[in-house]
Amino acid sequence: MCEGPSRISGPIPPDPTLCPDYYRRPSSAQGRLEGNALKLDLLTPDTDRDLDATPPRAPRIRPGGLEILERGRRGVGGVLLQLGGISLGPGASPKRKDPKDHEKENMRRIREIQRRFREQEHSREQGQSRPLKALWRSPKYDKVESRVKAQLQEPGPASGTEPAHFLRAHSRCGPGLPPPRVPSPQLTLPGPSAKAPGPGVDFITHNARTAKRAPRRHSRSLQVLAQVLEQQQQAQEHYNATQKGHVPQYLLERRDLWRREAEARQHSQPDPAMPPGHTRMPENQRLETLSSLLQSQSQLLRELVLLPAGADSLRAQSHRAELDRKLVQVEEAIKIFSRPKVFVKMDS
């Protein structure tokens, strides 16, 4: 089926048995890529062995090649699945460590600390005592003698041979005689003929009369309950007198706030009756203008009344006509500014 050697070249060499003469390689290449040709017998003719008289070299193997080969035979599953020193492979598992005994460790450390402390105490006791630091003393007392030293140097009145008589413990330190004791009265049992001292008293009648006059005392719990009920009654009376039926102060404040907000919204909204290009005159300015117009009207009327009735000159007639015209204008302005809303044209 194959017609001659293949012309396709690639990384995988073709089968050398198809065309042995064409695909023959040197011994070095055969040992490195295809294995030893003499061992694999890929080239069947014996005449090919004489072509290269040099014996082929053994394949080069790295130092870890045997380990890799053994690992491939056994598999790597046991190595990957070693859990806590327990191997799943055929190899022997390592020895497990015994759990640490913390109690023994703590006792050992405590004994060591105690031993060290005892050694320090022993060394401190054997060491020489340190000299005491002298207390500070003012230089002005250098020439003053010690009173204790002076008392010790004075000779005592008693000789050294005579023993000193000192008070001993639990000895009497007062006078030699004990203090006189008041004799206690002896109780004598009354005889059958003895009478009770004093007049006879009827204690039963006395106790009954005292019990009637004594006030009745209640228990502590009943007194506390009465005080609590009285406080509740006073609180209810105060509530009925001051708060019941009255609107709370916070509701009144909230009502005023709502009213001011509504007025502000109403003022901020444009008036539908206002013509375009106009603005509403403020209320205080409208009232001031109206008062000035009323004063002007009263002044013009006074001037008109003071005119002479029989004056028919041209000047008098023109002055009367001027006053009438001003009065008409003032009356028209009074009618306009007497309205609740006055719109003024804005300056363009």
UniProtKB/Swiss-Prot annotation:
Residues 253-345 form the Enkurin domain. Keywords: Cell projection, Cilium biogenesis/degradation, Cytoplasm, Cytoskeleton, Microtubule, Phosphoprotein. One of its GO terms (biological process) is motile cilium assembly. It is found in: Cytoplasm, Cytoskeleton, Microtubule organizing center, Centrosome; Cytoplasm, Cytoskeleton, Microtubule organizing center, Centrosome, Centriole; Cytoplasm, Cytoskeleton, Cilium basal body; Cell projection, Cilium. Residues 1-65, 84-195, 262-282 are annotated as: Disordered. The modification Phosphoserine is found at S93, S138. GO terms for molecular function: alpha-tubulin binding; microtubule binding. This is Enkurin domain-containing protein 1. It comes from Bos taurus (Bovine). The gene is ENKD1.
